[in-house]
């Protein structure tokens, strides 16, 4: 009985250490915080397209890019969502 418990603990611990030591499959380079901070802030101003206060601006934006309509949705209606039909 003791041997079975000891063998189980040993196998589980070896599997755990092998999983931790295994190399990562996705080694994509990370973006440094300085590069993100240096990016122009002009995109932040355009992100909402009038949402949540001016839904007409969102609608006009969506029509300008070839969509049928636009409305404010998502969390706290902060995202301009464009529809095709």
UniProtKB/Swiss-Prot annotation:
Main location: secreted
Annotated compartments: Secreted
GO biological process assignments: defense response to bacterium; defense response to fungus; immune system process; killing of cells of another organism
Record-annotated membrane-spanning stretches: none
Family indicated by similarity: Belongs to the invertebrate defensin family.
Keyword Disulfide bond tagged: yes
An annotated GO cellular component: extracellular region
Disulfide bonds: 51-72, 58-80, 62-82
Function: Antimicrobial peptide with broad-spectrum activity against Gram-positive bacteria, Gram-negative bacteria, and fungi. Also inhibits clinical isolates, including methicillin-resistant S.aureus (MRSA) (MIC=32 uM), K.pneumoniae, C.albicans and C.parapsilosis. Displays minimal inhibitory concentration (MIC) values similar to minimal bactericidal concentrations (MBC), suggesting a disruptive mechanism mode of action associated with membrane lysis. In vitro, shows hemolytic activity against human red blood cells.
Cited Pfam families: Defensin_2
Keywords: Antibiotic, Antimicrobial, Cleavage on pair of basic residues, Cytolysis, Defensin, Disulfide bond, Fungicide, Immunity, Innate immunity, Secreted, Signal
Post-translational modifications reported in the UniProt record: Disulfide bonds are essential for antimicrobial activity.
InterPro entries: Defensin_invertebrate/fungal, Scorpion_toxin-like_sf
Signal peptide limits: 1-21
Protein's name in the database: Fungal defensin triintsin
Keyword Disulfide bond set for record: yes
Taxonomic path: Eukaryota, Fungi, Dikarya, Ascomycota, Pezizomycotina
Propeptide: 22-47
Family matches, as Gene3D superfamilies: Knottin, scorpion toxin-like
């Amino acid at each position: 009985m003791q041997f079975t418990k000891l063998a189980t603990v040993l196998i589980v611990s070896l599997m755990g250490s092998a999983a931790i030591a295994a190399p990562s499959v996705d080694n994509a380079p990370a973006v440094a915080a300085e590069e993100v901070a240096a990016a122009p802030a002009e995109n932040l101003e355009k992100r909402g397209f009038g949402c949540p206060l001016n839904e007409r601006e969102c609608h006009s934006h969506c029509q300008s890019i070839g969509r049928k309509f636009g409305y404010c949705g998502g969390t706290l209606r902060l995202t301009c969502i464009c529809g095709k039909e």
